[in-house]
């Protein structure tokens, strides 16, 4: 018998809680996204995360351990190889990624790929290096507006990103070019996890801003996930933010794009008013995109505080047969060197108004605990060749 009719899983993108045992192998010595954020500010007001037990799970400055935490909580290790968005989310829903997605961080993309992209799109290409979005626009935004050239760049992730000015290049044209790039990068030697359309507005260097019309063209998951199992058995799988893009729409019954993390939480609150049975799967990307990669711990702290305010409203709306799970997909310590993700434990914080118990659970060896627990709740078997063990029976 189902314990919960609705499960809300919220991914605070990149909110790691300390380096994993193998983090040194990824160049991530001493990382701690949440801990170092708290140490970087004079005050850190997150009363709702506090009462759920965030500082009981991972003691941090300015935030007290709750005497009677409301939630069950534990740390999750990443079983897969990698520390990127797709690996983290795919593992949550049961996939074990044993071969990391290919990156072009140090080399840029092969000339043969760029030549083919130019031939197919009709646009010359500039950039072709690893850079932050703000840097590449400051450097090449004006040039692109004048010439119609495509800005192509990458990052520490397995991504090919294309920038286009919404007014001079055009959104439809940008999407067309990205679809061609996605087709080309399905070849093994050029394969990337995602092609990302990065539209922007503004008229000169220093004023360019990326817009919310971003679109991700992801690889399809390598196998069936918990999302497919839910959908195939008639349950709702409602996505918020970039979840649908990450899974290339696989297993999703309703997709809601977000303009910001605050907007994503507002969408979640609206979905809570709906009568559905199944999963609402939320990704809040601003933590990672605006603050983690840009190494801004103060901005990151403020974003968490904004989230906490909305979280309070979510807690008020939860029904007795609702379950809330708060987690993350990787770390991105904004005090660490470089601009890359960091290999960290992530939180598993589970709460329902019907829970009679609470407290610390043993660390688990995979993010896939989430997908397995969700499937178990709806009395479904996880697909073949997936990983993860349910902790549903402990959520009492």
From Swiss-Prot:
It catalyses: 2-deoxy-alpha-D-ribose 1-phosphate = 2-deoxy-D-ribose 5-phosphate; alpha-D-ribose 1-phosphate = D-ribose 5-phosphate. InterPro entries: Alkaline_phosphatase_core_sf, DeoB, Metalloenzyme, Phosphopentomutase_DeoB_cap_sf. Pfam families: Metalloenzyme (PF01676). GO terms for molecular function: magnesium ion binding; manganese ion binding; phosphopentomutase activity. One of its GO terms (biological process) is metabolic compound salvage. It comes from the Bacteria. Its cofactor is Mn(2+). Mn(2+) 1 binds at residues 13, 329-330. The keyword Cytoplasm applies. One of its GO terms (cellular component) is cytosol. Pathway: Carbohydrate degradation; 2-deoxy-D-ribose 1-phosphate degradation; D-glyceraldehyde 3-phosphate and acetaldehyde from 2-deoxy-alpha-D-ribose 1-phosphate: step 1/2. Its EC number is 5.4.2.7. Binds 2 manganese ions. CDD domains: PPM. Keywords: Cytoplasm, Isomerase, Manganese, Metal-binding. It is found in: Cytoplasm. Mn(2+) 2 binds at residues 288, 293, 341. NCBIfam families: deoB, PRK05362.1. Belongs to the phosphopentomutase family. This is Phosphopentomutase. The lineage of its organism: Bacteria, Bacillati, Bacillota, Clostridia, Eubacteriales.
